Amino acid sequence: PVNGATFDAHQEPFVTIPRPTDIDADASGRLYVSSWKNGQFNYDGPNIGFVAMITPIDFVPQPVPAVADLTALSLVELLRHPSAAMRLHVQRELLRRVAGADSNTRASVTAALRAVADDSSASQHARVVALWTLRQANAAAFGLAAASWLGDEELAEHAIRAVADLAGNADVQPALVAAVREQLSSPSPRVQAAAVIAAGRLGDREAASRLLQVASQPLEDAGADAAEPIDDWRLPHPQRVLPHLAMQAVVALDAVDACIEALPGSSSRGALWALKHLHSAEAVDGLFRTLASTRDDTLRQEIWTTLIRLSRCEGDYTADSPGWWGTRPDTTGPYYDREEWSESERIAEAVAVALGEAAEPLATHLKDQLARHVVEIGGGAAAPVAAMDELAEPIAVPA
């Protein structure tokens, strides 16, 4: 079930088969389910597994048209078929045809696809597949039509995704990028989420300030109404989705200036959240400038936390990387393999000075954050870290 920008976890058993491993559907509506019955690690043997065909009671399969024998316009109409497998098969055939077609055929297919997508009486799945087929078959024609679909409740989120389908695509006109940006204020969380992701993929830096507002939305404790106390992070948290997506979009835009300009202000939370992922001298400079100009103790503590996070970066994965994906990985975080970078020494010196001069509340906060981020200052560990005494050996699968 839909819940805001995401979905609630939901599982509804509909067929009873021992140890099912995979499922597929054909264009006539039949399901094929594979079972790993009696299987062990090696998967072999004469009586291991089976594939079952599942059909509704009294099901009468309908013959599937031979798509290779149909005209291009007939294929477009077949996009209205209720079977997703059939629609996918038809879409692929259409795209193959259009790729090698003459201009007249391309024009007629484009008009037919636009007609299906515009048809409010058609099913949503038919309209969406027509939209996406047009996006792939004729990007220019899609660009002309997309703006009108942004106001369509059924198509808006899909149109936005299609606009941003290829990150940094030069065929997306500035007016269309601006129209997508306007959807950041949509009342629909799903449309808003699509617009947030699109802003990052399209490189729309003008959206940065609005994205920071979304990333700074107040969050409630998901366990506040629970009968028994429970850690917030253990619970589904749909309201975190939009702020998280917005933060990631700001990072994708490398919007350091917008983040610094948001400090202090109502978007401070989102700005600092994004800055923790933006390892650049400009980000560190901006944080130190803000630190020197603000007297807000809470903001100062958050800036120091961000600087401590930025004092290390993620190392490149190599065969010698310590415990990245072994059976006992180091879960201390926030990085798998901490490495210093060009600003590490500068941040460390500033933290050391602050530790020597700060009043007790700030000094305690700095020590806590050094321990939390596993950062050493002045050659000594900030706090004990659980040592990985045993080598993380891979799991041995029986022969």
Q: Where do the PLM segments sit?
A:
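Structural signature of alpha-helical solenoid repeat scaffolds
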Residues: 95, 135, 164, 200, ...
